[in-house]
Amino acid sequence: IRSRMLRGETVPYIKEVNLPYLRHFEVDINFSLDYKNGRSELVRELVERAVTAKTGGVEIRTLARDDFFLHLCAHLYKEATTYPWIRMKRDMTLYKYIDLYMLLYETTTSAADEIAARAHALGLGTECYFAVSEAVNLFGDESGAGTRILRGLPDVDTNGLFSVISPEEKKEYRYTERDTVRRFFCADREKLLEEVGVWKP
């Protein structure tokens, strides 16, 4: 429990549902945008901009659309670029990429521009660029929203997108395979990493 709380998420809520192909329904509550419980002022800003959405006749509080999208990007980036998640094979979870793809599919040109601007304003350009480019590489970009967002983030160092940190070892690694599809279908992504130096938080 302590480990999970220090990594910015609660212990999952699990309900047995016994549906075909889905025995358990699991809900994670994430409250951090990076590997530790850092950037609390940023999380506070996202929560303060929360909106009320209606779904199934019920009103729920949720993040504003662009903030929700960026939170998904940051969460995906955190897991994909932190060594322990790669070791546990939780770094490229399919449903996270599908969530992003579906949101991109429904995103208008103006909304894509707003996402890029918001990512830049919040200092989440790298996280957004990484997640969007990976989702587009896996599924395509029928709506053009993914490409639009990427073009709106010209300052991102694309060479740095393939860095992985190991907080416990204080080491930095880099992927030797940059092709998203090849990495996704690799059974042991740890073998695709080469150590490149010391990681300084």
Kindly label every feature range from the protein language model:
Residues 2-201:
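Conserved NTP-donor binding/palm subdomain of two-metal-ion nucleotidyltransferases/polymerases, i.e.
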